[in-house]
Amino acid sequence: MAMAAAALWSSAASAQSYVVWGIGAERCAAWVDAKRSSDKVQRAAYETWAHGFLTGAGFERGGAIMTKASMDRDGVLKWLDDYCEANPRMSIERAVVALLGRLGGEK
């Protein structure tokens, strides 16, 4: 499984850099493959990473990113599905950061 490639890929977000670990460093093409796969565990791993990143960003920013009213769990996944379909070479982390920007939560 592609998850095994735990990442040492760095990304710049706003004026700060950070290391992206795990699935977030994979390309959106892997997200799309997981979505199409019959392996529900693999799909859940990608979804959990994205939800964890969003939760951490919300915590770090004092909850100022999103509420359940602004976009629910399924809305998040649908947005990321569409984004990754359109941007297969982008990293999953960048896709989630783009979603944060859409929700007004990018620093």
Where are each of the predicted segments found?
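Sec-dependent signal peptide recognition
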Residues: 1-2
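N-terminal signal peptide c-region/cleavage motif recognized by signal peptidases
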Residues: 10-12
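Short N-proximal segments of mature Sec-exported proteins
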Residues: 16-82
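Short, compact, well-ordered microdomains
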Residues: 73-104
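Active-site-adjacent structural elements in enzyme catalytic domains
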Residues: 107
